[in-house]
């Protein structure tokens, strides 16, 4: 190589324009894939194993279907509703994200420019150093996991056809509004509400919407509510492990760059999750006499959720404090308050998504308003002088902004989710028929999760040329 020559890896080519940062692009796609693995197969495995045996397939399929459905919604209209040009203060303009010229151009979040009242620029728009295609992929994984988390509130009784209608409607009218308002440059973003990686957009939204939908769908059968043991706790741990390690990309990818703030976010994520898991387990031992594996998983999740709104914005000691709070407050709301509050008893939130995601997400957003560190904020946020109340001065107002942002997300999800459920109920029953509730997977899908000889022979398609559903032919059979 001649002296002074640019190495091939850094030369500008048609496929590697001068604005492309290959390191950022590689990390962003890796982060997106890690988040995708949280859903596929992470939550598919977790849902399929944490429920009663007769609901294993139905629960896993709800997650599988949602993952695919969100992809189509996202690229056809929802991405630009969340991150495109402003239509309303809380909503972007719907248009496809499918054209080559759009997808290979540099990513620009046009509505994220911060302006003074006179119209002059205070902070430029966000322009990550990779193509739009990478951003579409990354954000699609967040949209997918949000609706899959929501599904956890509805396992064991929702009509699968109603769920198939619910997913695109909720993504369109609820998720896109929260995403644009807080991330895409909407009014909460402009005001300075902090949501680093989805404590509000993803977790508070899914927890509140899940509880609301559970109200409209109604409870599981009496026998299922009384006894609903996991069918495979070891697989629950496998799904939980994918969820935990996948959170490295979940929070580490949100600076939209492979920078020092990303490293801080990843470290804080694991500190908070570990602390929360230990606190939840200690409380289980102290009050119930023995540690619970399911309880430990719940503590892990609440820690991951709690750190998410401020993952790259708080110091390590604050991550420990947040872990202590996330391991104890959601534990109290789930194990004590839920059992004493008659209103919560009437709503059947199958996996306690309200506690593990809504309560923990709100807690994380509020504590971010307290502990957001000024220097770390300057590395990530577009709003100048952002900091938590703990650091004094104008930081006190940040806590109020965080509470106001949570109230908007909560109210929007209650109203929109209710409207969606009512509309669907006019066309399709929201619940599985009572007779099918007694049977489970076999009635809904004609399949069983653990079909062994004699038990599963009814649906063994190597013995029958058609499924138990009349009129549905089987093209290919396979011995496994």
Curated annotation (Swiss-Prot):
It is found in: Membrane. PROSITE patterns: AMMONIUM_TRANSP. It comes from Oryza sativa subsp. japonica. Belongs to the ammonia transporter channel (TC 1.A.11.2) family. NCBIfam families: amt. It is a multi-pass membrane protein. Keywords: Ammonia transport, Membrane, Transmembrane, Transmembrane helix, Transport. InterPro entries: Ammonium/urea_transptr, Ammonium_transpt, Ammonium_transpt_CS, NH4_transpt_AmtB-like_dom. This is Ammonium transporter 3 member 3. One of its GO terms (biological process) is ammonium transmembrane transport. The chain crosses the membrane at residues 31-51, 59-79, 135-155, 169-189, 198-218, 233-253, 265-287, 292-314, 318-337, 361-381, 407-427. Involved in ammonium transport. It holds the Pfam family Ammonium_transp. Its main location: membrane. The keyword Transmembrane applies. GO terms for molecular function: ammonium channel activity. GO terms for cellular component: plasma membrane. The keyword Transmembrane applies.
